[in-house]
């Protein structure tokens, strides 16, 4: 199977509509919850565990929706949105790699550390996700470590992010 190794915002939004991957019903969130503008690289065999990598970027602009409400007079990107982007990318990796069809759901993470913040004057957020484990049985689970950088400075780190692919989410 031939796969792309980078994706534009338009292609990511096609994933939100269920149009990019014909083999799966997994989707990314649509705007405004899609937390990256492009995937700059995705490979099945990268990273220190040899399980794959996915890197993405978000262009920061002062008019991004979250700056207007979090917080009034003290605008900052909510930390949970950066963490959610890491789960989004982990789920995208599973779908891209051909995991069985399913609906992606965040299952948790082992450790999260915030050491900085994203302010409206920042220019670029970069996400680097390294897959550490993929279980492909009845339930597909991906596990990853990730970091988030703002203007080339690491400010978030997450270890053992877990995403599951469910055939049915009614009892989840």
From Swiss-Prot:
Enzyme Commission designation: 4.2.1.59, 5.3.3.14
GO MF term set: (3R)-hydroxyacyl-[acyl-carrier-protein] dehydratase activity; trans-2-decenoyl-acyl-carrier-protein isomerase activity
UniProt-annotated location(s): Cytoplasm
Record keywords: Cytoplasm, Fatty acid biosynthesis, Fatty acid metabolism, Isomerase, Lipid biosynthesis, Lipid metabolism, Lyase
Biochemical pathway: Lipid metabolism; fatty acid biosynthesis
Family matches, as SUPFAM superfamilies: Thioesterase/thiol ester dehydrase-isomerase
Catalytic residues as annotated in Swiss-Prot or TrEMBL: 70
Catalytic activity: a (3R)-hydroxyacyl-[ACP] = a (2E)-enoyl-[ACP] + H2O; (3R)-hydroxydecanoyl-[ACP] = (2E)-decenoyl-[ACP] + H2O; (2E)-decenoyl-[ACP] = (3Z)-decenoyl-[ACP]
Annotated GO CC locations: cytoplasm
A biological process from GO: unsaturated fatty acid biosynthetic process
Record text on subunit structure and interactions: Homodimer.
UniProt-listed NCBIfam families: fabA (TIGR01749), PRK05174.1 (NF003509)
Summary of the function given for this chain in its UniProt record: Necessary for the introduction of cis unsaturation into fatty acids. Catalyzes the dehydration of (3R)-3-hydroxydecanoyl-ACP to E-(2)-decenoyl-ACP and then its isomerization to Z-(3)-decenoyl-ACP. Can catalyze the dehydratase reaction for beta-hydroxyacyl-ACPs with saturated chain lengths up to 16:0, being most active on intermediate chain length.
HAMAP family: FabA
Family label: Belongs to the thioester dehydratase family. FabA subfamily.
Official protein name in the record: 3-hydroxydecanoyl-[acyl-carrier-protein] dehydratase
Source organism (scientific name): Xylella fastidiosa (strain Temecula1 / ATCC 700964)
Upper taxonomic lineage: Bacteria, Pseudomonadati, Pseudomonadota, Gammaproteobacteria, Lysobacterales
């Amino acid at each position: 199977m031939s796969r792309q190794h980078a994706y534009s915002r338009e292609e990511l939004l096609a994933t939100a509509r269920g149009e990019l991957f014909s083999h799966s019903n997994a989707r990314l969130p649509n705007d405004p919850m899609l937390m990256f503008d492009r995937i700059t690289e995705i490979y099945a065999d990268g990273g220190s565990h040899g399980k794959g990598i996915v890197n993405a970027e978000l262009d920061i602009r002062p008019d991004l929706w979250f700056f207007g409400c979090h917080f009034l007079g003290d605008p900052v990107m909510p930390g949970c949105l950066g963490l959610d982007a890491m789960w989004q990318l982990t789920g995208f990796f599973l779908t891209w790699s051909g995991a069985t069809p399913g609906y992606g759901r965040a299952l948790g993470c082992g450790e999260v550390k915030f050491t900085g913040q994203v302010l409206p004057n920042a220019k670029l957020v970069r996400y680097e996700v390294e897959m550490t484990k993929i279980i492909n049985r009845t339930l597909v689970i991906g596990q990853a470590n990730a970091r988030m950088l703002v203007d080339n400075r690491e400010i978030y780190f997450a270890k053992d992010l877990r995403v599951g692919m469910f055939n049915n989410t009614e009892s989840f």
